[in-house]
C-alpha cells in the first residue's frame, strides 16, 4: 500500500514530516510517497538509513502556506505539495494521502480533484478528542461547513458512527448533538431540527444534547455540530489546555517545596499530557470525500506524522468510504 505525504505541510516540515515517514515504514508495511521539494528531501534522507524501496519522492516546488486563502491557492499553485498529493490519490497512484498543511487547502483540493462520495451533501473535517475513558470521541464538523442544514448534520452523524465502529470497534456508538443545553428543545432552529432528525432515525444510538463542558467526559462517542461551533469549541479547548499546563509549570517553579512536589508528580503529569497529546492519534479523516485523506495538526512532529500515516493505512484497509456509501441508503432524503 502507498500513502502520499505532503512533506512540506506543517510548522516543522520538511524535517519532521520526513522523519515521521521513516518511522512509519519501520512500524508498518506501507510505502510512503514524499511530495515536496526533492532537493530538500534528499538532503534530509541522506542522514538516515532506511529501506529505499519504501520511500519515494514526487517533486513539488510550490508550498501553500498556512495564511494563504485555500481556494485561490489551490488553483494558483497546482505544483504545490498539497495539490500534488491529492492528485496522486485521484490518479490511484497512491491509496491515501496525509497532510499537516493548510487545512482549508487540503479540503479544497480534495473537493476539486476527488469529489464527494455519491450521496454526501457536504464532507466534514473531524478530529479525535481525548476523554476520561480509554477511547477518544470524534467531533465533526470542526470547520469545513460554517453554515449547515439538518441533513448535513445527519450525514455527519452517520460518518462519525461508521468511523468509530470500524476504527475503534465500538458497537452502536453513542451519538450526541453539541448544544447550549442538555434538554430537548434547546438551541437554535438548526439544533432543534437536527435533534428531531437524529432522535427519530432508528440507525442512531442518539443520546441527546451535550454541552461544551461535557465534551471530554466520554459521554458520547460521536459529537455532531456545524463547523462554526465545532471550530470554536476545539480551539477553545486547545487554548485552555495550553494555558493550564503553563500555569502549572509556573506554580511548580515558584518555590522549593512546590518544585520538589512537582518532581514527585512528574510521572503523573506525563501520563495526563500523553492522554491530551494529539500526536497519539496522528490526525483525523476528511470524511465524505471520495478518497482516504487524513488531516494532521499543523504543529505535528515525527510521532504525529507516523501515526497519521498508520491511520491512513487502517482507514483504507477498513474500507470506510465504501461503508459510508452503504450507510447512506439507511438515511432518507439522500440527494446528491
Curated annotation (Swiss-Prot):
GO terms of biological process kind: fatty acid biosynthetic process; phospholipid biosynthetic process
Segment forming the signal sequence: none
Reactions listed under catalytic activity: a fatty acyl-[ACP] + phosphate = an acyl phosphate + holo-[ACP]
Pathway(s): Lipid metabolism; phospholipid metabolism
GO cellular component: cytoplasm
Keyword Lipid metabolism among record annotations: yes
Catalytic EC class: transferase
Keywords annotated in UniProt: Cytoplasm, Lipid biosynthesis, Lipid metabolism, Phospholipid biosynthesis, Phospholipid metabolism, Transferase
Top-level taxonomic group: Bacteria
A UniProt-annotated Pfam family: FA_synthesis
Family, similarity comment: Belongs to the PlsX family.
NCBIfam families: plsX
Function: Catalyzes the reversible formation of acyl-phosphate (acyl-PO(4)) from acyl-[acyl-carrier-protein] (acyl-ACP). This enzyme utilizes acyl-ACP as fatty acyl donor, but not acyl-CoA.
Name listed for the protein in its UniProt record: Phosphate acyltransferase
UniProt organism field: Dictyoglomus thermophilum (strain ATCC 35947 / DSM 3960 / H-6-12)
Classification lineage: Bacteria, Pseudomonadati, Dictyoglomota, Dictyoglomia, Dictyoglomales
Record gene name: plsX
Amino acid at each position: 500500500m502507498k500513502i502520499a505525504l505532503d512533506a512540506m505541510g506543517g510548522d516543522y516540515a520538511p524535517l519532521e514530516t520526513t522523519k515521521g515517514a521513516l518511522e512509519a515504514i519501520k512500524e508498518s508495511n506501507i510505502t510512503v510517497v514524499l511530495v515536496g521539494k526533492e532537493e530538500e528531501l534528499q538532503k534530509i534522507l541522506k542522514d538516515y538509513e532506511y529501506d529505499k524501496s519504501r520511500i519515494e519522492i514526487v517533486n513539488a516546488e510550490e508550498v501553500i502556506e498556512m495564511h494563504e486563502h485555500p481556494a485561490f491557492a489551490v488553483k494558483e499553485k497546482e505544483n504545490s505539495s498539497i495539490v500534488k498529493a491529492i492528485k496522486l490519490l485521484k490518479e490511484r497512484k497512491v491509496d491515501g494521502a496525509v497532510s499537516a498543511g493548510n487545512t482549508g487547502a487540503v479540503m479544497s483540493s480534495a473537493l476539486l480533484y476527488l469529489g464527494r462520495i455519491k450521496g454526501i451533501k457536504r464532507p466534514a473535517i473531524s478530529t479525535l478528542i481525548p476523554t476520561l475513558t480509554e477511547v477518544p470521541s470524534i467531533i465533526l464538523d470542526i470547520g469545513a461547513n460554517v453554515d449547515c442544514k439538518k441533513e448535513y448534520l445527519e450525514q455527519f452523524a452517520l460518518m462519525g458512527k461508521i468511523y468509530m465502529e470500524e476504527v475503534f470497534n465500538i458497537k452502536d456508538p453513542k451519538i450526541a448533538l453539541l448544544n447550549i443545553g442538555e434538554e430537548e428543545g434547546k438551541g437554535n432552529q438548526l439544533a432543534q431540527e437536527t435533534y428531531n432528525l437524529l432522535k427519530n432515525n432508528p440507525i442512531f444510538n442518539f443520546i441527546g444534547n451535550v454541552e461544551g463542558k461535557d465534551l471530554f467526559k466520554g459521554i458520547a462517542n460521536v459529537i455532531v455540530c456545524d463547523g462554526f461551533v465545532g471550530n470554536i469549541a476545539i480551539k477553545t479547548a486547545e487554548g485552555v489546555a495550553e494555558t493550564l499546563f503553563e500555569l502549572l509549570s509556573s506554580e511548580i517553579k515558584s518555590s522549593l517545596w512546590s518544585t520538589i512536589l512537582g518532581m514527585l508528580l512528574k510521572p503523573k503529569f506525563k501520563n495526563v499530557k500523553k492522554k491530551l497529546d494529539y500526536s497519539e492519534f496522528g490526525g483525523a479523516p476528511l470524511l465524505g470525500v471520495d478518497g482516504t485523506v487524513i488531516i494532521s495538526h499543523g504543529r505535528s512532529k515525527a510521532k504525529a506524522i507516523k501515526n497519521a500515516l498508520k491511520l491512513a493505512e487502517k482507514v483504507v484497509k477498513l474500507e470506510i468510504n465504501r461503508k459510508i456509501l452503504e450507510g447512506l441508503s439507511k438515511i432518507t432524503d439522500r440527494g446528491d
